[in-house]
């Protein structure tokens, strides 16, 4: 993971100043100029490249073809670089380094702009390529947008700039930041350097993989896909930690990743982080501690990070500005402090990569209604709604994970659930498997009985869930009459992620994962961490910026990025 910047209309000094402001790594900056095109990178080293001639304190990018006619910079990681490298070597390509950027470069030389469609690629990336043979400057980014990539295009003045972050282009003070565009994930943009025409084409959009299989087969397949995705995301030469809030998303992500690492051969121990407001009785922390106990056999350490309310309120303007979302919603802001405060602690402990369970709520339509999000669960589980969630995930969840973690660490974030094969499979899961019903309740109750071990060893939570399911089934698939609304809702939410529970059941048969931790249900993170309780304090403290939290956040962004509405 790095920061990239370049284009036409700036010089080397401008580009270096812009890269200085991106803050996506502290392992060196290099900028080079080729005629009127400038291209540069800021390095966050997670895997050594052994590239000859790299000067200490500089990035190893850009990478050039043997004749120097093609130059590439990469922000990201190519998890399957070894397999692709071997394939290219078999086709006659030679390599001067052991890193993944050169593999992308050789793949481009072999396949041209279609290289992004290569099915062997498992990667998060934003890439810029200067091809002097075709006289083109090309930029592209992964789907669903795990790496940000912005551009500014002014053909009348022959200006085209690209940047990993809006803060980079902000350093070019004559650029109107309202006119900077974020490249859509799964698109590739080609600038003809002779005509200065810009052509943008999609190269990938997800196609849900529909299946007629039952929930047991679905869970088994999901388990297989997640094992592969998680294993790939352990690539690198640096310590890896996990985000661990205690819910099933972070629980399974942590399991699949940590189960892929041989801790006897590395010099760090399995570590997870959970955040909450200081003094808040956090459901996140309580659930995380319960879940962490299920990982004790591998020596797992859970670190609880807290921050005072007053500090968090004072930091909100910087938190919002770091997020650099120009049309911001209050819904998007309250999760941000988790990343803002975790990143420095992770880095202080020696980590450079973290793993998160991001994407599950979007893939399965499993959001609680809150703030601007009001769609019912039935609407959310519609495939069209889930595709729409995924189309927009880069503007919110992925931006905060990538930009805030990198700016505050730098920490690179990786997401096993957002591997395209995993996404397409989960998007294809029929909505009938995402709701409570008599059939689903019977399946889950039977699984608990068959795989949960002796019932006298079950946790109270697991006993309560099984007891509720028994009463639900005895009532003909209806909630017990004496169950209050909150209990009914929590039981319904359990089934929103039934495929995950079944996948976890399969994983528990193959590993150390205890079945009971799969039933550690909880509310979503920012609520359980106590951050939403800060709303009144924020509105009172920054009343000069607006009458509501949403208005305050928008005005902070307007001022930070010279927006016309400021």
Model-inferred region functions:
Residues 40, 494, 519-521:
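Short alpha-helical segments used as structural interaction elements across diverse proteins
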Residues 202-203, 438, 514-524:
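Conserved S-adenosyl-L-methionine
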Residues 1-310, 318-322:
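Cysteine-centered catalytic environments shared across enzyme families
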Residues 8-13, 90, 133-135, 146-149, ...:
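ATP-dependent adenylate-handling active sites, centered on carboxylate activation for C-N bond formation
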């Amino acid at each position: 993971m790095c920061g990239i910047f370049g284009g036409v209309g700036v010089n080397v000094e401008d580009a270096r100043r812009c890269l200085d402001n991106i803050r996506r790594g502290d392992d060196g900056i290099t900028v080079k100029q080729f005629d009127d095109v400038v291209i540069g990178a800021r390095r966050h080293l997670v895997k050594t490249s052994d590239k000859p001639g790299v000067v200490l304190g500089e990035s190893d990018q850009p990478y050039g073809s043997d004749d120097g006619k093609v130059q590439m910079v990469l922000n990201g990681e190519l998890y399957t670089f070894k397999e692709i490298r071997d394939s290219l070597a078999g086709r006659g390509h030679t390599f001067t380094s052991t890193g993944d950027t050169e593999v992308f470069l050789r793949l481009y030389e072999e396949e041209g702009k279609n290289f992004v469609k290569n099915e062997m690629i498992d990667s998060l990336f934003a890439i810029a390529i200067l091809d002097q043979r075709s006289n083109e400057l090309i930029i592209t980014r992964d789907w669903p947008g795990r790496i940000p990539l912005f551009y500014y295009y002014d053909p009348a003045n022959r200006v085209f700039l690209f940047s990993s972050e809006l803060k980079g282009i902000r350093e070019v003070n004559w650029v109107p930041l309202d006119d900077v565009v974020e490249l859509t994930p799964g698109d590739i943009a080609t600038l003809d350097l002779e005509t200065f025409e810009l052509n943008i084409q999609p190269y990938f959009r997800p196609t849900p993989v529909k299946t007629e299989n039952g929930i047991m087969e679905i869970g088994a397949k999901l388990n297989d896909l997640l094992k592969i995705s998680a294993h790939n995301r352990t690539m690198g030469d640096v310590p890896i930690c996990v985000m661990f809030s205690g819910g099933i998303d972070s629980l399974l992500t942590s399991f699949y990743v940590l189960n892929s690492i041989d801790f006897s051969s590395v010099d760090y121990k399995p570590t997870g982080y959970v955040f909450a407001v200081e003094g808040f009785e956090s459901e996140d922390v309580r659930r995380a501690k319960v879940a962490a106990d299920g990982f004790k056999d591998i020596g797992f350490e859970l670190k609880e990070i807290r921050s005072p309310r007053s500090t968090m309120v004072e930091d909100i303007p910087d938190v919002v500005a770091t997020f650099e979302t120009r049309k911001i919603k209050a819904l998007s802001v309250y999760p941000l402090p988790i990343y803002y405060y975790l990143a420095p602690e992770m880095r202080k402990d020696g980590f450079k990569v973290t793993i998160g369970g991001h994407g599950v709520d979007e893939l399965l339509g499993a959001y609680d209604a809150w703030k601007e999000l009001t769609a019912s669960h039935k609407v959310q589980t519609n495939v069209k709604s889930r595709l729409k969630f995924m189309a927009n995930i880069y503007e919110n969840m992925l931006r905060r994970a990538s930009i805030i973690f990198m700016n505050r660490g730098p920490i690179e974030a990786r997401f096993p659930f957002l591997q395209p094969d995993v996404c397409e499979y989960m998007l294809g899961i029929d909505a009938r498997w995402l709701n409570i019903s008599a059939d689903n309740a019977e399946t889950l109750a039977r699984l608990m009985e068959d795989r949960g071990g002796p019932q006298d060893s079950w946790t109270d939570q697991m006993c309560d869930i099984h007891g509720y399911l028994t009463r639900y089934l005895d009532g003909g698939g209806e909630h017990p009459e004496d169950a209050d609304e909150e209990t009914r809702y929590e039981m319904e939410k359990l089934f929103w992620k039934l495929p995950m529970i079944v996948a976890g059941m399969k994983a528990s048969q193959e590993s150390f994962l205890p079945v009971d931790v799969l039933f550690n249900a909880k509310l979503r993170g920012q609520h359980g961490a106590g951050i939403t309780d800060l709303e009144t304090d924020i509105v009172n403290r920054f009343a000069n910026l607006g009458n509501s939290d949403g208005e305050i956040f928008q005005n902070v962004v307007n001022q930070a990025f010279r927006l016309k509405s400021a």
